[in-house]
């Protein structure tokens, strides 16, 4: 399909170029040019204020999220009283969570606002991630997500 051929495959190639030198046997299997890929699943998320997607990962090899509609601004979200007093003000953020080489749990946040509409995040499916709730906005946050797998020989 058009999306897979024109968006996912170039992202896989880009990912392969960045990470081909590390990872030993794992990377040799994933980044072999003869390995075919397939988009296994594709869905749309509609989230209302106060809703969130807890820490999780996906099946498959790669996953992606496309932010279609961000009806709030993270700067305004940070000013909401219960968010402002937090030691980690992250209302409305998309966050990756990982463990560093020393075992420390680390996170990388994508603060979201309308300028992020159309942004595609493409990442290994096993990287854990979450989406924090947003507040004081009646419009839904809309994203499209999916998973890429190795294509079965069957």
Regions found by a protein language model. Name each.
Residues 1-61:
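Signature of the catalytic double-stranded beta-helix
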Residues 24-26, 94, 148:
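Compositionally biased, intrinsically disordered low-complexity regions
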Residues 40-122, 130-132, 139-142:
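Catalytic core of non-heme Fe(II) oxygenases with the double-stranded beta-helix
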Residues 145-154:
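Double-stranded beta-helix
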């Amino acid at each position: 399909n058009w999306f897979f051929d024109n968006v996912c495959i170039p992202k896989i190639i880009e990912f392969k170029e960045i990470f081909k030198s590390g990872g030993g046997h794992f990377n040799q299997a994933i980044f072999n040019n003869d390995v075919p890929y397939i988009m296994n699943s594709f869905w749309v998320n509609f989230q209302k204020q106060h809703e969130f997607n807890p820490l999780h990962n996906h099946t498959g090899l790669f996953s992606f999220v496309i932010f279609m509609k961000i009806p709030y601004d993270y700067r305004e979200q940070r000013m909401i009283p219960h968010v402002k007093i937090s030691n980690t003000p992250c209302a409305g953020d998309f966050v990756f969570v990982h463990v560093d080489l020393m075992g420390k749990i680390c996170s990388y946040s994508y603060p979201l606002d309308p300028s992020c509409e159309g942004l595609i995040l493409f990442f290994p499916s096993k990287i854990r991630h979450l989406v924090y709730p947003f507040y004081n906005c009646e419009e839904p946050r809309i994203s499209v997500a999916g998973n890429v797998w190795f294509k079965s020989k069957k």
